[in-house]
């Protein structure tokens, strides 16, 4: 059974703090192993990637077969049903339209001193997207990672997707095609991250790596950060639902289970001022678990990390939600807009009972790659901005240099950086000669 907390009871603060501090991710000490894999790929290139793929994925490859050929992609895509294709195309269209609105504008102006200032935006040159592999891989994640990159203008876009035993989800290849991916490599794990970061004889290095993965992939992304950019280190999925009133307990139960079924370490929390609703939702969850296909996973998540929290009112519920800073936040209340205005920390907010989190996973439009483990306090979900760089611009006229140059010279002297000051003074002296 999940924890059942009540803000009015003694000991709540200690219990809630313990809930926030629960270690949900099984993160074995893989760093040494990952360091060895990365070093091996850097030293031996394709040979290391091929050997590691045979060992971990039971798949024999050659340099020529590291990437799917066009013929292989076409053959796999041909097996996708018309219904699945239409659903994926709708998702791609909506994700593309949403992210197109995120594109920022360049700026240029002249300030009071006469200096021309501004900034311009430009895409990174290349990106590598990691997609967990096998039949359980998620084509929606391909769309959510690749489409923002394409909208941003990234020139070269590749996917690394392990294919254990040679098995690939055709929908992943279709998603890659719809998103405009240039190449799909059938490799995974830390070796794929290393290949994308450092390159091999066959695989060209990229500038940024995004996408989820297991502990080995996460550790590899940490290690290559600095050589390349990364999106985030994502943990187990999580959802917090604030609910009140006449909402259907079964709907809330299904929304909680939609995250619980991802992973035994996922977390689902209901916060409500209505204790009766909270207990009804618990009963509905138990009933749904009896028939849910992934009931073993969802049941373990709900049992070990689930919680129902009864509050005095919705204002208190919002305050508790901010302390959790959930990846996904559903507001199943009479006035979700008013409650959302009280929320500061959430990866994504789903407004009203007709907006289940699952819509956001697929066809809502906003990105489903979101900050977890309370990192929504200081970070945001994946967006076009993750594939753009801002370059600042400055142009001094002689008059502007006269106006601000002496202050720059004084500051350089105060920091004992002689050449800095002299570089300004030389120009000021030339102006004074005139």
Curated annotation (Swiss-Prot):
It comes from the Bacteria. Binds 1 zinc ion per subunit. It is an enzyme of class 1 (oxidoreductase). GO terms for cellular component: cytosol. NAD(+) binds at residues 130, 191, 214. GO terms for molecular function: histidinol dehydrogenase activity; NAD binding; zinc ion binding. Pathway: Amino-acid biosynthesis; L-histidine biosynthesis; L-histidine from 5-phospho-alpha-D-ribose 1-diphosphate: step 9/9. Its EC number is 1.1.1.23. Substrate binds at residues 237, 259, 262, 328, 361, 415, 420. GO terms for biological process: L-histidine biosynthetic process. Zn(2+) binds at residues 259, 262, 361, 420. InterPro entries: Ald_DH/histidinol_DH (IPR016161), Histidinol_DH_CS (IPR001692), Histidinol_DH_monofunct (IPR022695), Hstdl_DH (IPR012131). Keywords: Amino-acid biosynthesis, Histidine biosynthesis, Metal-binding, NAD, Oxidoreductase, Zinc. The keyword Zinc applies. Its cofactor is Zn(2+). The active site is at residues 327-328. It catalyses: L-histidinol + 2 NAD(+) + H2O = L-histidine + 2 NADH + 3 H(+). NCBIfam families: hisD. Belongs to the histidinol dehydrogenase family. Catalyzes the sequential NAD-dependent oxidations of L-histidinol to L-histidinaldehyde and then to L-histidine. This is Histidinol dehydrogenase. It comes from Cereibacter sphaeroides (strain ATCC 17023 / DSM 158 / JCM 6121 / CCUG 31486 / LMG 2827 / NBRC 12203 / NCIMB 8253 / ATH 2.4.1.). The gene is hisD.
